[in-house]
Each structure stands twice: as C-alpha cells, then as structure tokens.
C-alpha cells in the first residue's frame, strides 16, 4: 500500500524498537487500546475485526476520523485511509525484523482543500504526528517486550 505521493502534505519516519515484530504488531493491531499508549489519540474503536475493509473510528485533535483498513499483513504491514473535516488521509506502517528487534517505517499523506491552502501547517502537523506516534509506539512495544 502506498500513500498519495501527489498530496500536498506527506510525512515519513522510522524508528528502531527493541521488540520482536510480533510484539510491535500486537500494539498497532489493538486499535481499541491506542488511547492507552498514544497521548495524541483520545478515542479509538474498531468494528468488524482487523481485516481489509474493516472500519475504525478514532479521535485525534479536533475531529473524529473514520478510517478503513486497506492493507493488513501481520506482522509486516498495516495501512488505512480515512477522512475527517475535509482531509483525506492515507497511513502505512511497515515492520522489518532486525537483529535487535524491529525497524518501523511510517508514512502518511494528507490531501483536501484545507491542506492545499495551509500546506506548511499541514506538513508540520503531519510530521509531528508521525514522530510522536513512533516514539509512543516504541515506548509501549519495549514495555511489553
């Protein structure tokens, strides 16, 4: 799965985590538990189980986001697309095993009128979200390892 490479706001990040890919996957795949380890997420609820086509709703920032899983390949890749307040987002996490644990790559794109008008602020917000999310994921996965 790929993010929208033509979108006006794209953010990427990577982090090394001292936990096996299966542990990192379990943290990412437990959608309902996201608010317990990621302070940027206030609510999260998955309906239909973790599979392509399933929908989850979550609250991050001022709006509630409705997202649909586009890719679910345990414990390698998870990706979704979603909409909130006129913003179209596409997000992907890729996990690669390493000698010390897991390298996680995250990428997200934002598109929509408001993103096009406020490109700079949108890019900064998106990059801060990727960086903060990866740091929180690392902390939780290493705690569970």
Predicted regions and their residues:
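A short, structured loop/turn motif at beta-sheet edges
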Residues: 18-22, 70-75, 94-103, 144
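Glycine-centered tight beta-turn/hairpin loop motif at sheet-sheet or coil-to-beta transitions
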Residues: 8, 62, 86-88
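Short beta-edge strand/loop motif at the mouth of beta-sheet-based domains
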Residues: 12-13, 32-64, 73-77
């Amino acid at each position: 799965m790929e993010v929208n490479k033509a979108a006006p706001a794209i953010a990427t990040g990577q982090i090394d985590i001292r936990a096996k890919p299966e542990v990192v996957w379990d943290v990412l795949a437990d959608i309902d538990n996201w608010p317990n380890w990621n302070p940027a997420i206030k609510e999260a609820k998955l309906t239909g189980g973790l599979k392509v086509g399933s929908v989850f709703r979550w609250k991050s920032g001022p709006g509630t986001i409705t997202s649909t899983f586009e890719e679910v390949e345990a414990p390698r890749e998870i990706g979704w697309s979603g909409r909130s307040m006129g913003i179209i987002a596409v997000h992907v996490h890729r996990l690669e095993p390493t000698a010390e644990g897991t390298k996680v790559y995250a990428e997200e794109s934002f598109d929509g009128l408001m993103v096009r008008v406020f490109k700079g602020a949108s890019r900064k917000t998106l990059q801060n979200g990727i960086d903060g999310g990866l740091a929180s994921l690392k902390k939780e996965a290493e705690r569970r390892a």
